[in-house]
């Protein structure tokens, strides 16, 4: 509530600045509607000779008004990628995973009478969550020290943008083509982090306990088998936590965006610890 609109850019984007104090926030419910669509499919079958399998697919297209990634009002406000800082519009949710495939294959057999041996493989492949490419917020809101305004992609002879002498036009064009952006403002979380895949393996062997009705088993779990075989495989990815500012920009007196410098930044964050393979050997007793 401490910022008021003082003008617009040549694109019609509102420009805000502090008018009544600084960093005063009023939390209320939005009058905008965020929508979501999701569905899932599962197929499975069990065979009488000990084999069973399952394959599933899930699709999600979910919006939110604010991802609420912080425990404080200030950073929740500052970290939202948007072009409307007051009463922001719905956008693709930071937590949206568009596509996820899961599969399980298991086989059990009694090689020793009364004691089952079983091997189970679990696999998933999922698309990364979305994140936003942004430009500078200088001259677009009070402070504006951290860029969080959605990137504007100029078209040919676009009068909304002035390019500075240090701006790498060729690198920027290559970036736009790689990311698949069209002319105009990119959408919030329009692009996604890289896909991740993982294969886990579990081997169980039932064993006698000689303790009445109790049961025992020895198990071996291998998490991320692909990474165990090849350390360049099975890598786990997530979207960068913060929006990625690729253009250092400001607004001139005519309301045009001035693109000063370009920095190529991707949206994908490698989760190193989760990408490592792990093996566990244990004994389980059930009384």
Predicted segments with their positions:
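Gram-negative outer-membrane beta-barrel transporters
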Residues: 1-130
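Residues that define the transmembrane beta-barrel architecture of outer-membrane proteins
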Residues: 35-37, 97-101, 195-199, 275-279
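Outer-membrane beta-barrel architecture
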Residues: 42, 54, 104-106, 202-204, ...
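Extracytoplasmic gating/loop element in the C-terminal half of outer-membrane beta-barrel translocons
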Residues: 112, 118-210, 217, 242-274
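Outer-membrane beta-barrel "beta-signal"
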Residues: 273-287
């Amino acid at each position: 509530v401490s910022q008021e609109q003082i003008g617009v850019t040549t694109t019609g984007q509102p420009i805000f600045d502090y008018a009544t104090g600084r960093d005063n926030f009023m939390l209320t419910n939005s009058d905008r509607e965020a929508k979501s669509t999701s569905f899932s499919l599962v197929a499975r079958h069990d065979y009488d000779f000990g084999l069973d399998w399952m394959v599933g697919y899930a699709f999600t297209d979910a919006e939110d008004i604010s991802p609420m990634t912080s425990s404080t009002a200030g950073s929740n406000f500052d970290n939202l990628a948007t072009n409307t800082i007051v009463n922001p519009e719905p956008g693709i949710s930071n937590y949206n995973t568009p596509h996820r495939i899961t599969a399980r294959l298991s086989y059990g057999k009694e090689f020793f009478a009364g004691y089952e041996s079983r091997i189970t493989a679990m696999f998933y492949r999922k698309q990364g969550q979305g994140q936003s490419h942004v430009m500078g917020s200088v001259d677009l809101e009070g402070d504006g020290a951290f860029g969080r305004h959605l990137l504007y992609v100029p078209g040919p002879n676009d009068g909304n943008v002035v390019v500075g002498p240090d701006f790498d036009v060729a690198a920027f064009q290559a970036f736009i083509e790689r990311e698949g952006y069209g002319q105009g403002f990119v959408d919030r979380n329009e692009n996604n982090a890289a896909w991740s895949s993982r294969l886990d393996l579990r081997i169980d062997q039932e064993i006698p306990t000689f303790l009445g009705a109790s049961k025992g088993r020895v198990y071996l779990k291998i998490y991320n088998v692909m990474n165990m075989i090849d350390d360049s495989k099975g890598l786990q990815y997530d979207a960068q936590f913060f929006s990625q500012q690729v253009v250092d920009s400001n607004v001139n007196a005519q309301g045009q965006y001035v693109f000063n410098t370009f920095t190529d930044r991707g949206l994908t964050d490698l989760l190193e610890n989760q990408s490592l393979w792990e093996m566990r050997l244990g004994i389980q007793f059930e009384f």
